[in-house]
Amino acid sequence: MSESSTYFEKQRDMLIQEIGVSIESVVYNLDILNRSLNGSISVGKEFDNVGRLWSHFYDGLNQLKERNNQEETNKNDQGDANDDDSSSDEHGSSDEEIDQDQEN
C-alpha cells in the first residue's frame, strides 16, 4: 500500500505543480491585460479636452443657427405684417376711389 500512496503522492505533486504553473500564467496574462487597459484609459483621457473643444464648437454652431432662424422668422413675421398693412391701404384707397366715382 505504500507503493500506491507514493504513486498517488507523485501524481498529486505533479498536478499541484501544473496548477501552480497555470495560475502563474493567468496572473501574468492578467497583468498584461491590466497594463493594456490602463494604456487605453490614459489615451482616452488625453482626448477629453479635444472632445470638449469640439462639443463647444458644435454648441456654438447650433446657437448661431437658432439665432439665424429666429431672425428670419422675425423678419418674415414683420414682412407679413407690412404686407397686410399695405394691402389694406390699397384696398382702402380703392374703396375711396369707388366712392368718389359714384358721387361723380
Curated annotation (Swiss-Prot):
The protein's assembly and partners: Component of the DASH complex consisting of ASK1, DAD1, DAD2, DAD3, DAD4, DAM1, DUO1, HSK3, SPC19 and SPC34, with a stoichiometry of one copy of each subunit per complex. Multiple DASH complexes oligomerize to form a ring that encircles spindle microtubules and organizes the rod-like NDC80 complexes of the outer kinetochore. DASH complex oligomerization strengthens microtubule attachments. On cytoplasmic microtubules, DASH complexes appear to form patches instead of rings.
Gene Ontology biological process terms in this record: attachment of spindle microtubules to kinetochore; cell division; mitotic sister chromatid biorientation; protein transport along microtubule to mitotic spindle pole body
Biological role stated in the UniProt entry: Component of the DASH complex that connects microtubules with kinetochores and couples microtubule depolymerisation to chromosome movement; it is involved in retrieving kinetochores to the spindle poles before their re-orientation on the spindle in early mitosis and allows microtubule depolymerization to pull chromosomes apart and resist detachment during anaphase.
Superkingdom of origin organism: Eukaryota
GO molecular function term, any single one: microtubule plus-end binding
Alphabetically ordered keywords of this record: Cell cycle, Cell division, Centromere, Chromosome, Chromosome partition, Cytoplasm, Cytoskeleton, Kinetochore, Microtubule, Mitosis, Nucleus
Keyword Transcription regulation on entry: no
Biased composition (Acidic residues): 95-104
Annotated organism of origin: Debaryomyces hansenii (strain ATCC 36239 / CBS 767 / BCRC 21394 / JCM 1990 / NBRC 0083 / IGC 2968)
Family of this protein: Belongs to the DASH complex DAD1 family.
UniProt-recorded name of the protein: DASH complex subunit DAD1
Biased composition annotated in UniProt, kind: Basic and acidic residues: 65-78
Subcellular location field: Nucleus; Cytoplasm, Cytoskeleton, Spindle; Chromosome, Centromere, Kinetochore
Region (Disordered), start-end ranges: 65-104
Any one GO cellular component localisation term in the record: DASH complex
InterPro entries, per the entry: DASH_Dad1
PANTHER family: DASH COMPLEX SUBUNIT DAD1
